[in-house]
Every structure is written in C-alpha cells, then in structure tokens.
Amino acid sequence: MPGQDTRPPPPRKKLARRPGFGFAEAAMTSNRVFRWSGVTGLALLMGTAANCSAQTNADAADAALRAGRHFLAVPVYSAEDDQRVLKLFEGLRVADVCDGMDKAGLQNIGLMDPDIRPLWKDAREFKHRVVGIAVTARYVPTQDPPAGARDAASFNRWMGDWYGRKSSEPFVPLLRPGSVLVIEEHGHDVGSIGSNNILSWKRRGCVGVVSSATARDTDEIIAEGVPLYFKHPGRGIRPGRNEIESVNAPIVCGGVLVKPGDVVVADGDGVIVVPRGRAEEVAAYARATLLEDKAARTRLYEQLGLPKDKSVD
C-alpha cells in the first residue's frame, strides 16, 4: 500500500545472562521484567522453600527445648521381667551387691550417701531389708505463697486444692508388686511421706520407700513395719511447701542417679542402686560373695557354739 513501511523489523537484541542467575533481563519502558528460566529458576525456588522450612524446624526445635526436655532415655520393663530380675537379687545384702558392682567395674557407682538410713531395723528377721525395682518421683520447693491465716474450712479447701493440683501422687498407678518408691526432694521440714500414704503404697505392692529428704508420723510407720530409708523426720504438710515436678524420670537421690527400672537394695548398711542393664552380671557376682560369706560364718558359728540365725540359714 502506498506509504506503508515495508522494511523488515529490526532483530531482537539478545539479552546477556548474569552469572549465577537463572533469569534474563529485558528493558521495557522504565520497568525491569524478569523471565524465569526452567531448571535454574525452579532450583532457586526450591532452595528458598528449603531455607524457610529449615528455619521453621529450627524455631520449633528451639521452642521445644525452651519448654524443657529430658535427655536420658527411660526404658520400660514388663512386670514379668521385673520379677525375673528380683529373683536374682533375692536375699542379697548391700555388702554383697557393693562387691558385685566392684567386680563388674562399677566401683563407687550407685552407693547412696550414708546419711540415708533405715527408720527402723529388725535384727532377727531382717524385715527392714529391701530389694525392689525403682519407681521415681521428684518434688521441688514451691514458689507460691502459703495459705496465710484462714478459718478451718477455708484452710481445708486450700489444702485439698494444693494436694490435687500441685503436690499430688501421680506415681501411685505405677506401683506394683516389687516396686521401691524412690523420691528426690529437697525440703528440710516437710513430711511428704506419712503413715497413711505409705500404707496405701504398700497395698499396691510397694516393698519400701527411699527418700533424699524427710518423713513424718515416724512412730506409726515403725509400728506398721513399712521399710523406709530417709534422712530425718519432717513435720510439715506438702501444701505450701513443695510441688510434684516429675514421675518416672531419672532423679538424683542420695547423690546417685536413679532411673526407673533400676534395682534398689537397702539394709542396715544403707542403699545401693544397680543400673538395670548390668543387673544380671552384678547379681551373679553378689550371689557368689554371699555364699562364700555364709559358708565361712557358718563354720565360725559351729566352732563358737552359736545357734544359727537367719543370716546363715
């Protein structure tokens, strides 16, 4: 057509690719427009998503750690396995088990401070002796204020609420025949253990209680015949003084680590804790020690004309 420009369009300018980028640049008026190239652009997108995901995971891990975490594993053992292990330790003394720990390469491990002692002893039948499987609980001092002056009804409501919400006994369902309740506590004058609850624990099969702190109603506990190993009497109630922190987690009692499922042996010499994973080996060494001791003392009894007692039978 007359006046029409029939010249071919100018060739499109080739765009230089920037090193390290997967897109091309084009000049379009005053704006910069980016065009994604297939593989490189997808990789960049995926990398950005991965970075976001990694940051999210890191934030979640940080939040979980700040909320508290136990790093020591707590294996769960069946009641049948507990009974099998307890038979291996039946009749063994703390001295025998201590020697067994030495022979197993566990010298100075598991021996609680000697100030954790039996509340009472039976020198004839040795009913104060304990061989059991650890169930653990940890009580900590409270940061909340005490009740203050109240009338009896108001105080009882406050006390019941504290027992229910803050200082309960959630370990009770875990107690079964052969259990030893081991309590970590730091109160100086609080009777977390008393003549009532210790009997209820015994009813569930608990064969004894070990505490790093105190107990009250000690005269009644002696009369009841429940083995108790502790530091000294404490007189106050738990409300206003302590709170339950954990149940069946690793604790420290008498200066030693106690894990749920460990074997606890206690007598007039104190308390020793055997790691569950080494229990069979330690029991075998300890049994040999006991048999040798009984044989030697039996001969001495006979030479001295002493009547046999339960320690050599």
Label each region the model flagged.
Residues 108-110, 133-136, 146, 179-182, ...:
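Structural motif
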Residues 37-48:
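Bacterial N-terminal signal peptides
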Residues 163-164, 169-212:
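Extracellular/luminal Protease-associated
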Residues 52-54:
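Boundary at the C-terminal end of the N-terminal hydrophobic targeting segment
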Residues 21-23, 34:
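Aromatic (phenylalanine/tyrosine) cluster motif
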Residues 57-171, 180, 301-305:
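Intrinsically disordered, low-complexity regions enriched in acidic/Ser/Thr/Pro/Gln residues
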Residues 231-309:
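Acidic, glycine-rich flexible loop/linker segments
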